[in-house]
Amino acid sequence: MYNSIIRMILPIAVTFLLGVLIRKIKLMDQDGCNTLKRLISKIMLPVVLLNAFLFADYNGGVMIIMAVVFVAMLIMFGAGFLLSRLMPERAKYMPFLFTTLECGTLGYPLAAMLFGALGTSHMAIVDVGHTVFLFLIAVPLLQSVDGGSADAKSILKNAVTSPTFDTMILGILLGVAGVDERLAASAGYELYQSVVDFISAPTGMLILITLGFDMSLRKDLMKPVLFTSVLRVVIMGVLCAASCFIIFRFVPYSREQLCILILAFTLPASYGLTTFARFEGHNDYVATTVSFSTILTLILFVCLTVFAYSGV
């Protein structure tokens, strides 16, 4: 068992450190890293997400999970707003770092490492509730705070121009229409799956390299960063326990679903927030908080992997 866990965790650690090394030896500059991110977000992740939403199991339990996750995100935003009063110099953007989940570039690859396609399907259900919160609540509020437009036209534009949102909607529509069953029963299914697997295979590796490359832990920012990151993890832990209790009162328990819910609640704030606001005067704080939260996520993922395969 422990050999299997080490085989799963070691590549993650090595690849993340490889990203740090690439930056240190200047093998790639920030433009190169940004190009990798665009490749991941506009091509590779949409393929992963479309496949996950297409083959997700849409039943009554899905709506419960979506609703619980949405409410949890609202509670986290409220908690961030209240706690931001303790650090007024960072109060403007702190609530946004307490809520949202980086399901796209981190949650799906880690879920796939745990349980393969089943893991990504479970994460997709969690991501629906989160994505609705992101585009209906978080982004409009963020743009309003940042001095931008938060009207209905702006909200709609942000949603329809997001590959994550587009693939989520398309995957759900195709899945509900039964395209997944017809595709799985067709002669072309193996060909389809081989193409999806080939395109999505390096996604996790490339994401970890970019995360390692972007890691920035400035000493002068560590107090607000630690305050935000650690409190986020603690409150998310409490919300995760409450959410799992509620969900499994209505949804049949499965160890895989439990582990994916725990994984989701350990994820850092959405990296996509930086594309919707300037964070003027707070860029370093936001970037460093996300970097540190990502490290915490990877550490907690190690613990989750042990739990997932320990049989406890």
Predicted regions and their residues:
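Alpha-helical transmembrane segments of multi-pass small-molecule/ion transporters
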Residues: 1-312
